[in-house]
Amino acid sequence: MWKVLIMKLFSLTCCSTADMPVDFFRQNDIPFSCFHFIMDGKEYPDDLGQSMPFDVFYKKIADGAEPSTSQVNAEDYEKMWEPLLESGSDVMHITLSSGISGTINSARVARDNLLSRYPERKIEIIDSLGASSGYGLLVTTACTLCDEGKTLEEARSWIESN
């Protein structure tokens, strides 16, 4: 039996707050931007339990630690997207809900900076209007659309109308 290979027509990216396992992102070639959190006076990337395992994180909270968070900055987005643009790929980025974070604004600043250098490319930024598992479900659906060979415009249209 022949296996049909479908070329992806765009690159999908998201934020670590989509709360999917790191293996999901690796297996599906989805770069993610890391939010950061501060705990006990030290800053950590929210890299899905790689820098601080989840059991350690939750034990610290149970022991009284009070973490705070910071959003992704424009420079981090530029570092994530520029190699994709250089390779000739357009980008769809799905952000954490604008209702709970301003990270979409950082993404827009990065997009505008990069498109001035890569005017032939496209960067579509989609507000997930969700968080955690709801956000993750949207990323999973976008991944499926990308894998099916949908164009950036087709995928965006489907996501925004559903």
Go through the PLM ranges and name each one.
Residues 1-6:
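Short, Lys/Arg-enriched N-terminal segments with co-localized hydrophobic residues
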Residues 11-76:
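N-terminal glycine-rich anion-binding loop in soluble enzyme alpha/beta folds
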Residues 74-84, 109-111:
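Short, charged beta->alpha transition segments
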Residues 90-98, 124-127, 141:
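Short glycine-rich or small-residue beta-strand-to-loop segments that form or flank ligand, phosphate
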Residues 96-117, 137-139:
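Short Gly/Thr/Asp-enriched flexible loops that form oxyanion-binding sites at enzyme active sites
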Residues 111-132, 151-153:
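Short, acidic/small-residue loops that bind anionic groups at enzyme active sites
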Residues 119-120, 134-147:
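Acidic/polar active-site rim loop that often engages polyanionic ligands
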Residues 144-162:
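Internal, active-site/partner-interface "lid" segment
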